[in-house]
């Protein structure tokens, strides 16, 4: 199963904590996160997915966007 973990770069801290918790719960059930590695909400979802080592597909506008690592989870357009 897939879910999109996206939102505002200006998401309040308490909401980002909830997003991280949700991503952890979904990750524990093997859901795959799709997101964009932007600050704020995207990063909160990504943190939750990373905590459970769950699958991710992170779509970047360019290589190393926001310091993204060069791993197969991080996708850059050709």
For each predicted feature, which ranges?
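Acidic/glycine-enriched connector segments
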Residues: 1-4, 9-78
